């Protein structure tokens, strides 16, 4: 059966998959290019430069906004079942490549949520790609030769030179995106789903996997959530009235608060997360679709406190807090975001005073996705904001 390399852009073969062409020098290799929705066969027996040259007409140095193919489109381009398949990492920091790698995994083995599919789903081999925030453990790492490096350089300079000065960040060819060691790892469809959800943390696709941040599995996250619940209890009691948890995700903090006797109005705009939150909600929990903007605009949900825990990463207008119907707002964020966004705003306003600052969880390194990768968890610090004139 034919070996297949499935990439979003034609130049990606030269950037990340030259060692695959070397390993299949005596076999035809099918290359599927998602952006062009086309394929080309690189015949056996040709030199690396000759093979790469066949991809030249498919290089499109333009923008990065074309609609991505869906899994059925990719499956049609693959034709009969491939023997081996290589593609992008679903955890690539270049989000369109990550999404395309995820799409390929779904095209090869349609995702099934049943536990039985997890250990035996068909696999694809992914290039580690580009991600400064997540280290994926490679199954193989292959150094290219000087001649292969020259072939890469020549192809990019002649066929994709515009990408060396692209203003589109994901298309820009930088030195680190032309690796001398090509690294690959193998994933099942279920693992691809989890990696893609993790890297999509600021978008709606974060909900494609259950518990993408592993709140229910991570020792770090459990300690952080326990500390956050205890911190909340120090500032308001269940007898003070309901509390509003903004951006409750799937309800790990919600569950802890409900267990302490609080009436929690848990809001979650993401449809997927909200469905899981509602399914698992305990007595005393009301699940709502409101965003921070909705809550501020409507001003209807009077509460003892509003909890904004690890959710101010979406460039929300912080003046919205002024319109929340409460005298107490508890914010938890990593230190960098507090320093860059929250503290400058606090210094310029007079509606709120800082009643407490506290470390809820220190930074740590932690494995994710069952040891497939690891990353730095950035820690969490809490700020209690009390409306001017409020006293305990």
Features from the language model and the residues they span:
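Conserved glycine-rich SAM-binding loop
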Residues: 249
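Conserved beta-strand signature within the Rossmann-like core of class I S-adenosyl-L-methionine
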Residues: 327-338
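Conserved SAM-binding strand-loop segment of SAM-dependent methyltransferases
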Residues: 283-294
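Conserved alpha-helix/loop element of class I SAM-dependent methyltransferases that forms part
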Residues: 220-238
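Class I SAM-dependent methyltransferase SAM/SAH-binding core
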Residues: 252, 260-284
């Amino acid at each position: 059966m034919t070996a297949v390399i499935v990439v979003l852009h034609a130049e990606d073969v030269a950037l990340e998959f030259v060692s695959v062409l070397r390993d299949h020098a005596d076999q035809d290799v099918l290359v599927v290019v998602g952006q062009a929705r086309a394929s080309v066969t690189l015949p056996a027996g040709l030199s690396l430069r000759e093979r790469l040259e066949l991809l030249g007409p498919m290089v499109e140095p333009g923008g990065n906004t074309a609609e991505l193919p869906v899994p059925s489109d990719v499956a049609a381009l693959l034709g009969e079942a491939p023997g081996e398949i290589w593609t992008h990492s679903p955890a690539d920091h270049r989000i369109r490549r990550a999404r395309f790698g995820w799409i390929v995994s779904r095209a090869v083995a349609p995702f099934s949520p049943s536990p039985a599919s997890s250990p035996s789903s068909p696999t694809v081999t992914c290039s580690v790609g580009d991600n400064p925030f997540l280290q994926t453990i490679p199954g193989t790492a292959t150094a290219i030769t000087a001649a292969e490096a020259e072939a890469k350089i020549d192809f990019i300079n002649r066929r994709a030179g515009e990408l060396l000065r692209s203003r589109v960040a994901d298309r820009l060819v930088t030195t680190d995106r032309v690796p001398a060691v090509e690294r690959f790892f193998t994933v099942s469809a279920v693992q691809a789903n989890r990696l893609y959800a993790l890297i999509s943390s600021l978008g709606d696709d974060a909900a494609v996997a259950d518990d993408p941040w592993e709140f229910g599995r991570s020792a770090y996250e459990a300690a952080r959530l326990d500390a956050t619940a205890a911190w909340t209890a120090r500032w308001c009691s269940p007898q003070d009235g309901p509390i509003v948890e903004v951006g409750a995700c799937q309800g790990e903090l919600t569950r802890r608060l409900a267990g302490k006797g609080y009436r929690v109005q848990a809001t979650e705009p993401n449809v997927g997360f909200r469905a899981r939150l509602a399914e698992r909600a305990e007595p005393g929990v009301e699940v709502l679709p409101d965003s921070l903007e909705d809550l501020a605009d409507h001003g209807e949900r009077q509460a003892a406190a509003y909890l904004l825990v690890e959710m101010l990463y979406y460039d929300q207008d912080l003046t919205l807090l002024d319109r929340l119907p409460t005298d107490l707002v508890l914010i938890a964020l990593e230190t960098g975001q507090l320093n860059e966004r929250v503290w400058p705003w606090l210094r310029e306003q007079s509606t709120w005073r800082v009643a407490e600052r506290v470390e809820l969880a220190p930074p740590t390194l932690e494995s994710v996705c069952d040891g497939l990768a690891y990353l730095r968890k950035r820690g969490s610090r809490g700020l209690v904001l009390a409306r001017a004139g409020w006293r305990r």
